[in-house]
């Protein structure tokens, strides 16, 4: 059966939301695109801090300038504005991404600023649920696991033009202190490598990061040590309207918990989705993070839930969704982590 035009658009939309940018300027070798979304959403849960309105607006700008036939300059900024806070609340806006750099043809790109950490190159493959997901080891401002500040990033696609589908990332993160201890980091390095076997439907990836820990982090009750390390590996299949992905990672003295960090955390994520030709996309996933060697606790699940979701795409710009997070944590877990289910219901307009 032939794929419909709608199904093809939706598969591209799901694969990379950033490609939905609208070009607003393209003249004299300078280009400017804008993109964003309005997510009108409500959480239903017995957990009071999660129950209620979760509406937000996300807006971004991508710019590019052709310096010469080989060298291109670029920049990107992305911010999020809460729609569930009062107008006088100064915490309603946050910067997600802010970086600038240069790209030299087959030799790769280099940029600096607030960006995605190298470990997220693997974790992104399973961060595909309609609302939840991607939270076993990836957390914002947690070393190089997700979005973070002070990142110098080198990326090379197709390995200098020699191997189709072999992509390399090298990253350095400068220390960030003077903030909440769990959001701090010392100097660190990271790398990732992915390969799609020359343009096939299958892909594999791996990543590793190592960072110095700060003095403030070592003053916390749990997980003392000079280094925070992580590694991850992933598999992905994306073809014939089917999306399958799985990820396994381990962190050392990096994953934040009550009273500090877990000395070790083992993390697993999996997702399966199917895009129907008429716009419906069901999703089934599982996320697990198990803390090990925790002072006064031993082993304990940090994250453990089944996710069942459903998205209906009216077109490439508008969708409605429901996402059910079925919490599998024990109510008497020793770290006092919430064990309530959450249902997210909403609509998204994206451009």
UniProtKB/Swiss-Prot annotation:
InterPro entries: Gram-neg_bact_OMP (IPR050298), Gram_neg_porin_domain (IPR033900), Porin_dom_sf (IPR023614), Porin_gammaproteobac (IPR001897), Porin_Gram-ve (IPR001702), Porin_Gram-ve_CS (IPR013793). Residues 1-21 form the signal peptide. It is a multi-pass membrane protein. GO terms for biological process: monoatomic ion transmembrane transport. It holds the Pfam family Porin_1. It is found in: Cell outer membrane. GO terms for molecular function: porin activity. Keywords: Cell outer membrane, Ion transport, Membrane, Porin, Signal, Stress response, Transmembrane, Transmembrane beta strand, Transport. Its main location: membrane. One of its GO terms (cellular component) is pore complex. Induction: By phosphate starvation. Transmembrane segments: none annotated. Homotrimer. Uptake of inorganic phosphate, phosphorylated compounds, and some other negatively charged solutes. Belongs to the Gram-negative porin family. This is Outer membrane porin PhoE. It comes from Klebsiella pneumoniae. The gene is phoE.
């Amino acid at each position: 059966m032939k794929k419909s035009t709608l199904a093809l658009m939706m598969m591209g939309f799901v694969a990379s939301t950033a490609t939905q940018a609208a070009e607003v300027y393209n003249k004299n070798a300078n280009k400017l695109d804008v993109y964003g979304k309005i997510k009108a959403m409500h959480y239903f849960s017995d957990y009071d801090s999660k129950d209620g309105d979760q509406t937000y607006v996300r807006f971004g700008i991508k710019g590019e300038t052709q310096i010469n036939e080989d060298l291109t300059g670029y920049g990107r900024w992305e911010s999020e504005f809460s729609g569930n806070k009062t107008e006088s609340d100064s915490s309603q806006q946050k910067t997600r991404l802010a970086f600038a750099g240069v790209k030299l043809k087959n030799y790769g790109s280099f940029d600096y600023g607030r960006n995605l950490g190298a470990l997220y190159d693997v974790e992104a493959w399973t961060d595909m649920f309609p609302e939840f997901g991607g939270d076993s080891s990836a957390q914002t401002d947690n070393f190089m696991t997700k979005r973070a500040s002070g990142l110098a990033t080198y990326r090379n696609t197709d390995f200098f033009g020699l191997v189709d589908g072999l992509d390399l990332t090298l990253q350095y993160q400068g220390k960030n202190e003077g903030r909440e201890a769990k959001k701090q980091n010392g100097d660190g390095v990271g790398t990732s490598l992915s390969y799609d076997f020359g343009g096939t439907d299958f892909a594999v990836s791996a990543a590793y990061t190592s960072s110095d820990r700060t003095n403030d982090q070592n003053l916390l009750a749990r997980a003392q040590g000079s280094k925070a390390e992580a590694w991850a590996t992933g598999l992905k299949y994306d073809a014939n309207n089917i999306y399958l992905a799985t990820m396994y990672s381990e962190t050392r003295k990096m994953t934040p918990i009550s009273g500090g960090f877990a000395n070790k955390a083992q993390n697993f994520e999996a997702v399966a989705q199917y895009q129907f030709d008429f716009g419906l996309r069901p999703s089934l996933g599982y996320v697990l993070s198990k803390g090990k060697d925790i002072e006064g606790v031993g082993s304990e699940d940090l994250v453990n839930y089944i996710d069942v979701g459903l998205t209906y795409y009216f077109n490439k710009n508008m969708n409605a969704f429901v996402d059910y997070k079925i919490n599998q944590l024990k109510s008497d877990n020793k770290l006092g982590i919430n064990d309530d289910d959450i249902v997210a219901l909403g609509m998204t307009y994206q451009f």
